[in-house]
Amino acid sequence: MQQRRPVRRALLSVSDKAGIIEFAQALSARGVELLSTGGTARLLAEKGLPVTEVSDYTGFPEMMDGRVKTLHPKVHGGILGRRGQDDAIMEQHHIAPIDMVVVNLYPFAETVARVGCSLEDAVENIDIGGPTMVRSAAKNHKDVAIVVKSSDYDAIIKEMDANEGSLTLDTRFDLAIKAFEHTAAYDSMIANYFGSMVPAYHGESKEAAGRFPRTLNLNFIKKQDMRYGENSHQQAAFYIEENVKEASVATAQQVQGKALSYNNIADTDAALECVKEFNEPACVIVKHANPCGVAVSTSILDAYDRAYKTDPTSAFGGIIAFNRELDAETAQAIISRQFVEVIIAPSASEEALKITAAKQNVRVLTCGQWASRVPGLDFKRVNGGLLVQDRDLGMVSEAELRVVSKRQPTEQELRDALFCWKVAKFVKSNAIVYAKENMTIGIGAGQMSRVYSAKIAGIKAADEGLEVKGSAMASDAFFPFRDGIDAAAAVGVSCVIQPGGSIRDDEVIAAADEHGIAMIFTDMRHFRH
């Protein structure tokens, strides 16, 4: 039989008060004596609950503006005391056993995220007593239950009811693991915050505060285990950040279909992040992390139809992302036309879900609408290390573009250039994208030489019978030689958008002028490896 421990006395001290009143009422109704501190104690007393202030229990007042509340032997002795081993010394010093500790910590992350947060504000939101109690209770989980998540309140009450007011060892052990994860994440946030301030903090006035902390502490929560990773011989799991603020594959809800695979998640992320670039109704189809068809239109149905036409062969078994609600007409078009692994959209109508339900293996995800893109960090694992950089949220406006050719682009060429520039950002380097009338007509991805990416984009367009003449071409990085321009001109490209910055820019511009091509510089590169 599981080793059970009855809960007779609980200490409650929480910054996040969500659910605490109901939980305390449930504990009190089951005969549990309540100890509490500061604001939590006042809140419980206001609700008519019998609660003893920790300062009354210890005989020692809170002091130093609340910095010292629970750091007392009567508190920590009651938590750390081993039942059946330390009973005599606890009785000698009038230490009552505390069977449950309910604590969550000062909101450090929320504090430092505020605009204008000072170092003093950050320091005052470093919890000391809370983590100490959490660690003490987790260490002594054989006898004490530590509760750090309000989402566990209901399950705890149900288990107490099923076990005559007791909790099993398995439950206490699971709660202890959550507690150590909680304090580890909390300390990591503090270390990252202070670590990024190291140069300035030590008074090196000529050196700005570091963009990246001296030691990088990462905290991710496992969302799911997977059958396997990128390949069947690799084990895998999906971890997500806590409190993600932007609609993403990590926050998406799966409303139908088989479990997502490792490759499904990677490809869905690529598709969703690409479709976020567009304000108009848009569709992005991705295969092996590369867009194989992208279009914008007046409806997502037409956008899907045009995106599919770019490369129907590659679209088979692909990932489809939209930036508008999935409607019934579009769902029917997809299901009738092709095999698809994943469809992701901000939402899906009931009628659309009835249609996709006919294909139970199709995974349908809804991620919610996004208002803006949230700056963050990108990571790339290398053997023995981690490359860290800012997320690529770089964008260029029409006003920032530089026309460097003799011929100015037409209005349509300019629209197509800006469209395919957005797409090129999400194509593996070397990336070349041909576009015409707000749809991709050829994509050359991942080639070791830029000219071959340009040639492949032209071949793709020809294979699908798409008219290249008068199209725009985007390149994610500069052209090192004129050959890429010559290849584009040979198939009818009339406008090129690229970062510029090559030592041979003059030769490349001259090639554009020779072919009557309008050339636009963005002065921004979008390598993607």
Curated annotation (Swiss-Prot):
GO terms for biological process: 'de novo' IMP biosynthetic process. CDD domains: IMPCH. It comes from the Bacteria. SMART domains: AICARFT_IMPCHas (SM00798), MGS (SM00851). Pathway: Purine metabolism; IMP biosynthesis via de novo pathway; 5-formamido-1-(5-phospho-D-ribosyl)imidazole-4-carboxamide from 5-amino-1-(5-phospho-D-ribosyl)imidazole-4-carboxamide (10-formyl THF route): step 1/1; Purine metabolism; IMP biosynthesis via de novo pathway; IMP from 5-formamido-1-(5-phospho-D-ribosyl)imidazole-4-carboxamide: step 1/1. Disulfide bonds: none annotated. It holds the Pfam family MGS. GO terms for molecular function: IMP cyclohydrolase activity; phosphoribosylaminoimidazolecarboxamide formyltransferase activity. Its EC number is 2.1.2.3, 3.5.4.10. PANTHER family: BIFUNCTIONAL PURINE BIOSYNTHESIS PROTEIN ATIC (PTHR11692:SF0), BIFUNCTIONAL PURINE BIOSYNTHESIS PROTEIN PURH (PTHR11692). Belongs to the PurH family. The IMP cyclohydrolase activity resides in the N-terminal region. This is Bifunctional purine biosynthesis protein PurH.
